[in-house]
Amino acid sequence: MISEIKSILEDPEGDLLNWMVPRPKAEDENWYNWNIENWGTKWSLSDVYIDNCAEEDSIEFSFSTAWAPPIDAFRSWAERDGRVQFNLEYWEPGCAFVGSAIYDGDYFDDEYIDGNSEPDAYKLRASADWGYEEWEEPEPLTEWYKQGVEDKGLNK
């Protein structure tokens, strides 16, 4: 199974989440809602980097997803397969969330910290787990918008 996962991850057209929890053809027009409901995120994995694949029974890799971690896909796959265990660690600085999810074959647990509602916990976890230390306060959208209007000369 690990070699199959590795080949999917190495294929530029590979779609690991669809391999884990296949989207029915009948849902192709409703892909957005189906993906969110079944994978937990809107698109499959991108920017995949295989960190370690030395053993036939484990693989470590990092990836990007849109807006949310694909915990639902990993959990459904693990519960259906019976041989799968996982430990996900994730951080999304753009949307300001960080967390983890584990499944050991019997027990599932996850922790999600929203940086907008729990800024201190978010900063602590992102610093401890990801080494991130540069904390900039987000610029208000109105200031960003005003600057864009000015830069494009739309205020004249």
Regions found by a protein language model. Give the residues of each.
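Intrinsic low-complexity, intrinsically disordered or marginally ordered coil/linker segments
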Residues: 1-156
